[in-house]
């Protein structure tokens, strides 16, 4: 019998904080009713940053949901979160921002699935590697 490995398309979805209420409804449907969706697609991650996040790249996101609730939802479905910290103008004095460091500490705690960060700044990348080694 020819057992072929079926390729899977891993989708990386936007709006980690901005679309939290949508994902609270969509994710149960996606995982509990797989027959409604193509079997060759999967959710690789959901990315974003909350409103007023200094390390974000200036996007106009309006998500202000509790980061613990957001993380809990993704853990429930085994989905990786990716924080978008793509601000290209960061300087060393910005690295101590309480909101951003708090988010990193929270998302760094998750063993399974591992969470990641999308960065632009080498300065921020080095900082994150040293202080939050579980983030990829």
Regions found by a protein language model. Name each.
Residues 2-11:
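Extreme N-terminal starter segment of soluble prokaryotic enzymes
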């Amino acid at each position: 019998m020819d057992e072929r490995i079926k390729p899977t398309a891993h989708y990386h979805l936007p709006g980690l904080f901005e679309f939290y209420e949508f994902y609270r409804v969509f994710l149960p449907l996606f995982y509990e009713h797989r027959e409604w969706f193509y079997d060759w697609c999967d959710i690789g991650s959901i990315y974003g940053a909350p409103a007023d996040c200094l390390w974000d790249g200036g996007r106009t996101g309006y998500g202000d949901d509790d980061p613990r609730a957001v993380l809990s939802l993704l853990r429930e479905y085994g989905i990786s979160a990716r924080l978008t910290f793509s601000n290209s103008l960061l300087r060393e004095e910005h690295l101590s921002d309480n909101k951003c460091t708090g988010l990193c500490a929270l998302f760094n705690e998750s063993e399974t699935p591992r969470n990641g960060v999308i960065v632009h700044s080498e300065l921020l990348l080095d900082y994150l590697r040293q202080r939050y080694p579980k983030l990829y």
